[in-house]
């Protein structure tokens, strides 16, 4: 009998609350610096419109690129050493990097630190893996849906707080404040998260081929990874053109930035409301039904976005789209839980994070390229086509299987 087996049972609901708080803090920390990132790039000596645009895009994207590369390594280490340790590593590492960002003297230092931020990240996928391995399987949809709202809440609050702090104290102090938030996350995780984990030696670890063979349906798991990528591509493709599209719809108004900010935020608000409820519904009727329905609903909302005539119409459609999006990633994660074992949960969720990061990089590039060649409205139609392909692909993958019966 291992020492862990003598410990009292873990209160997974308490861990869920603490993990939610950790995801909220890291989501807020990441988005705090987003509103003024181009301004900081300019402050570091980059001048000229084209150079500023190029460097802003590079320093934004490089974090996701290096996160995609590093996630599988951290996932494997989580399966060997425990998920709590990876949460602590991520929060502390990102906190230190944020301090160094506030001290950067030129664009190359900042670029390297943004890459390092991606390498040391991984709080959210490891939080997902931790909760997925502790929660009763018939509550996975609700738990993972609830957990997803933590990061969304932080990402909604972060830009507003970051903009206010930058206006009040300047750009560099915001990095130090962000570091403080991440250090707080470190201590909350250290003292409040509980995990019973028996470390696994490197020799006992399943190798990649064994991980694949241990999956109940490897092709389905791969299709879920692809679904995650396409979800992020669809979300990111609209980001580069949203403000310009709103300006085109609004005409000659003075508060176009405020209107754009509102329209950018409403999907997150809708996702906050929908994710736990649709996750709970998925536990009852099956997450695969939620996934396919939400994908089809997304297609039906993206198409009319190409034909709207006012910002209000766009805002309403974006709100409804956010409600559908709030169900997508939790449904994918729940299906990953159903089709993998706790022994490899860290790697499975980290692979999924890698696909998500690739989508975060490619989505804005796709949106910018389409809008440059065919106009803003074409972006919504092409994105709808991509999501429709994903719906058909996911349905084809899911129809060959049944969700196994789950129990407490």
UniProtKB/Swiss-Prot annotation:
Any one GO BP annotation for this protein: response to antibiotic
Topology in the lipid bilayer: Multi-pass membrane protein
Pfam family, one: MFS_1
Record Gene3D superfamilies: MFS general substrate transporter like domains (1.20.1250.20)
Source superkingdom: Bacteria
One GO cellular component, as annotated: plasma membrane
GO MF, any single term: transmembrane transporter activity
PROSITE patterns in alphabetical order: MFS (PS50850)
HAMAP family given in the database record: MFS_MdtG
Functional summary from the UniProt entry: Confers resistance to fosfomycin and deoxycholate.
UniProt record similarity statement: Belongs to the major facilitator superfamily. DHA1 family. MdtG (TC 2.A.1.2.20) subfamily.
Name the UniProt record assigns to this protein: Multidrug resistance protein MdtG
């Amino acid at each position: 009998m291992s020492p862990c087996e003598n410990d009292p049972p873990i209160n997974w609901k308490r861990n869920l609350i603490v993990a939610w708080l950790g995801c909220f803090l890291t989501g807020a920390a990441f988005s705090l610096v987003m509103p003024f990132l181009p301004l900081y790039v300019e402050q570091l000596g980059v001048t000229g419109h084209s150079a500023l645009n190029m460097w802003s895009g590079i320093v934004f994207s490089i974090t996701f690129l290096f996160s995609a590369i590093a996630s599988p390594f951290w996932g494997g280490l989580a399966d060997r050493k425990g998920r709590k340790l990876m949460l602590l590593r991520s929060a502390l590492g990102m906190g230190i990097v944020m301090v160094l960002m506030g001290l950067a003297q030129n664009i190359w230092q900042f670029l390297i630190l943004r890459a390092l931020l991606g390498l040391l990240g991984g709080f959210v996928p490891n939080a997902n893996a931790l909760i997925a391995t502790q929660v009763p399987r018939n509550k996975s949809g609700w738990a993972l849906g609830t957990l997803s709202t933590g990061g969304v809440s932080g990402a909604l609050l972060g830009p507003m707080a970051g903009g206010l702090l930058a206006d009040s104290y300047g750009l560099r102090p915001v990095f130090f404040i962000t570091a403080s938030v991440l250090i707080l996350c470190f201590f909350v995780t250290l003292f409040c998260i509980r995990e019973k984990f028996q470390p696994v030696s490197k020799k006992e670890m399943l190798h990649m081929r064994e991980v694949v063979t241990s999956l109940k349906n490897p092709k389905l798991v791969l299709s879920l990874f692809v679904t995650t990528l396409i979800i992020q591509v669809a979300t990111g493709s609209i980001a580069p053109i949203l403000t310009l599209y709103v300006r085109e719809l609004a005409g000659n108004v003075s508060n176009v930035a405020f209107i754009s900010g509102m329209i950018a935020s409403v999907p997150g608000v809708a996702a906050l409301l929908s994710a736990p409820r649709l996750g709970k519904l998925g536990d009852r009727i099956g997450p695969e039904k939620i996934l396919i329905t939400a994908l089809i609903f997304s297609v039906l909302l993206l198409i009319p976005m190409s034909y709207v005539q006012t910002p209000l119409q766009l805002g309403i459609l974006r709100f409804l789209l956010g409600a559908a999006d709030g169900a997508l990633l939790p449904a994918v994660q729940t299906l990953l839980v159903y089709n993998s074992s706790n022994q490899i949960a860290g790697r499975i969720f980290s692979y999924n994070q890698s696909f998500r990061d690739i989508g975060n990089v490619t989505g804005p590039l796709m949106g910018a390229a389409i809008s440059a060649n065919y106009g803003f409205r074409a972006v919504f139609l092409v994105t709808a086509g991509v999501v429709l392909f994903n719906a058909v692909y996911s349905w084809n993958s899911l129809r060959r299987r049944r969700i196994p019966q789950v129990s407490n």
